[in-house]
Structure formats: structure tokens, C-alpha cells
A protein has these predicted regions:
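N-terminal signal-anchor module of multipass membrane proteins
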Residues: 1-58, 64-67
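Helix-coil boundary and interhelical linker segments in multi-pass alpha-helical membrane proteins
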Residues: 1-14, 71-86, 141-162, 219-223
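Juxtamembrane membrane-water interface segments of multi-pass membrane proteins
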Residues: 31-54, 72-75, 104-115, 179-198, ...
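Membrane-interface helix-loop-helix modules in multi-pass inner-membrane proteins
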Residues: 55-128, 147, 223-231
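Long, contiguous internal "core" modules enriched in hydrophobic/ aromatic residues
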Residues: 105-259, 273
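Hydrophobic alpha-helical transmembrane segments
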Residues: 159-174, 301-319
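Juxtamembrane non-transmembrane "cap" segments at the membrane-aqueous interface
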Residues: 268-290
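Short, membrane-exposed interhelical loops at transmembrane-helix boundaries
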Residues: 285-307
Length: 344
């Protein structure tokens, strides 16, 4: 296969890895943000922790995979991206570290104040990635000030522009809704009722922020140009809207798993909508279009991409099957018996 074909395949796979990460770790992050609002008692807070408990660390594998693929398949894009977005990515790393610590440390001491401290850490360390990921991807869609040498000529505050902030709030609302639906699946009783109501309240928020983000995308980016050049891509926003519409429909029908699947479809299609709108661009330069790093000029050698593709065709299905088995194993709603000494 030629370099252009291989680079295109890996661009799609790279997008898919990010989409899968957003779907799987998105509900974990959303649960953490919802913790102080839905966890009214110690038992309810433990239910929220344990709704994410068996999954959260395995879900982060997809983030590592996305970063690893960026490094191996698109080394030039990796170098520029991690240099330009160094500050938000470092903040993201620290947030994920503290999130892991909050899971493990919370129940190590029998003290209400100790648990309250780590509940606060847990909330912040889940809120931050939601916002940071949205801000980072919105700025990638819009373009960042990098020159032909890959040197970033901006600042962290420069990333907090109107479009970046809209992206952060949009991601936050999606993950919160996604997490609320997961809590409907994993709980019973009063907590489930409040989670269901919360998902219903968040749905119109997601819709409004989606419309705002789409309007700002028209004025701030060139994403829609790809949809004029490649009309078949219109299936992505159509499927995204179908997924979003399916959330309240399935919740009202008492089918939370299908509602969560609809939310997952929405997340996947929104991710592909934005990233495929950049194609073949990966790091769009707002200073000089010639300095833009694309999937073609930033890719590894054809031999490297072929070897990686062979490995991916073997390993990715294995990981997917394992995670499917794990989700199936822990698909039952939580009960008080699940909150034993070994639970969170």
C-alpha cells in the first residue's frame, strides 16, 4: 500500500481510538463530576464510585493507545501537538493521577473529613479532564499558532478563547449526561430516579451547547469545507443527531442500555465529525497554512505503518473482546452487598 493510503487508514484508526476513549472514560469522568450533586449520603457516594470502579482504569488504556498511535504513526504531529498543548496536557496528566489516587485513598481512613477531602479531589480531577479535552480539541479544530519549525507561539490563556471554552463546556455536558445514564443502569431506587431526572435535565443542555458549538464551528474553523468536498461525510452529523435523539426516547421507554448506546453513538459521531472535518490536517497552523501538519507529511514510513497495522488488526479485537466480557460480567445493578470491604 502507498503512504497516502496507509496514512489515511491510520488517521481513521487514530480518530476511532479517541472516540472509544471518550465513550468509555467519558461516563467515568461524568460520574465524578456528578458525585457532589447526586451523592446525598455516604452509601450513595459509594454507589457512584463503584459504578465506575471495575472499569475506570481499563478505560484509560484507550487514552494511552491514542497517545501511542500519535507517537508511532504520526511522529511529527505528536512532536508539535505535545509541544503546543504542553500545559493543558500536563494539567490533564496531573488530574488523571489525582483521580486514580482519590479512588484508592478515599476509604483508607475511617474519617468523614478524610472522605470529604478525597471526594473534593475526585470531583476536581474529573471536572478538569472534561474541560481540558474539550478545549484542546476545539483549538485543534480551529488551528493553533505554530510555525514551520513546529514552534508554538501562543500561551495557555490563548487556548481559552470563545471556541475553546465552548468546546470545554460541550464536552463536559456530554460526559455528565453519559455518566448519568450509566448511573441509571448501575443503581436502583432513589439514586436511580435522581440519575434519570439528571440525564433528562442534561439532554437539552447538550442540545443547546451542540447548536452553539456548530454555529461557532462555522465561523471559527474550516471544518465544513470538507463536508462540501466529500458530501458522503454528512452521514456523521446525521448519525450524531440520531444518537442524541435516541437518548430521551430510550430513557422514557425504560431501556437505559439503549439510551447509553445512543449516547455512545452521539459521542463517536461528534468526534468523527470534528476530526474528519480537519482531514488530512492534524495540527492546523493559524499562522501559515504551509506549516500545517497533515496525516501525509507527518506520517511514519510505509513499513512502520504496515507493521503497526498488522499488530493493530490482532491486538485491538482482543482488547475489545476482553472489555466486552468485562462490561458483561459487571453489567448488573449494584446492591448494598456489592459495597464490601474491597469495594471503593
Amino acid at each position: 500500500m502507498e503512504l497516502e493510503t496507509l496514512a489515511t487508514i491510520w488517521f481513521v484508526l487514530w480518530t476511532l481510538l479517541w472516540a472509544v476513549y471518550f465513550v468509555l472514560d467519558g461516563f467515568d469522568l461524568g460520574l465524578g463530576v456528578l458525585l457532589p450533586f447526586l451523592g446525598k449520603s455516604e452509601e450513595e457516594r459509594r454507589f457512584i464510585y463503584n459504578a465506575a470502579g471495575p472499569f475506570w482504569d481499563g478505560n484509560e488504556v484507550w487514552l494511552i493507545s491514542a497517545g501511542g498511535v500519535t507517537f508511532a504513526a504520526f511522529p511529527k504531529a505528536y512532536a508539535v501537538m505535545f509541544s503546543a498543548l504542553y500545559a493543558p496536557l500536563l494539567l490533564l496528566l496531573f488530574a488523571l493521577i489525582f483521580r486514580a489516587v482519590s479512588f484508592e485513598f478515599r476509604n483508607k481512613v475511617e474519617s468523614a473529613s478524610w472522605r470529604a477531602l478525597w471526594d473534593g479531589v475526585h470531583f476536581v480531577s474529573n471536572l478538569a479532564p472534561c474541560l481540558l479535552l474539550g478545549v484542546a480539541f476545539a483549538n485543534l479544530f480551529m488551528g493553533i499558532p505554530v510555525d514551520a519549525q513546529g514552534v508554538y507561539h501562543g500561551s495557555l490563556l490563548g487556548l481559552l478563547n470563545l471556541y475553546g471554552l465552548a468546546g470545554g463546556l460541550f464536552f463536559l455536558s456530554i460526559f455528565m449526561m453519559h455518566g448519568a445514564i450509566w448511573l441509571v443502569i448501575k443503581t436502583k431506587g432513589d439514586l436511580q430516579t435522581r440519575a434519570l431526572a439528571t440525564a433528562g435535565l442534561l439532554w437539552p443542555v447538550v442540545l443547546v451547547l451542540l447548536l452553539v458549538f456548530l454555529v461557532l464551528t462555522f465561523f471559527c474553523t474550516d471544518i465544513y469545507a470538507n463536508y462540501w468536498r466529500m458530501p458522503y461525510l454528512v452521514v456523521l452529523p446525521l448519525l450524531a443527531l440520531a444518537g442524541l435523539a435516541g437518548v430521551p426516547t430510550m430513557l422514557n421507554a425504560g431501556k437505559p442500555w439503549l439510551a447509553w448506546g445512543s449516547s455512545a453513538l452521539f459521542i463517536v459521531c461528534v468526534t468523527f465529525f470534528g476530526v474528519m472535518g480537519m482531514f488530512p490536517g492534524m495540527i492546523i497552523s493559524s499562522l501559515d497554512p504551509a506549516a500545517t501538519v497533515t496525516a501525509f507529511n507527518g506520517a511514519s514510513s510505509p513499513m512502520t505503518l504496515k507493521i503497526m497495522l498488522g499488530v493493530a488488526l490482532v491486538m485491538v479485537p482482543i482488547v475489545l473482546l476482553y472489555q466486552f466480557w468485562m462490561y458483561r460480567l459487571f453489567s448488573h445493578p449494584l446492591t448494598a452487598r456489592d459495597l464490601d470491604d474491597h469495594a471503593y
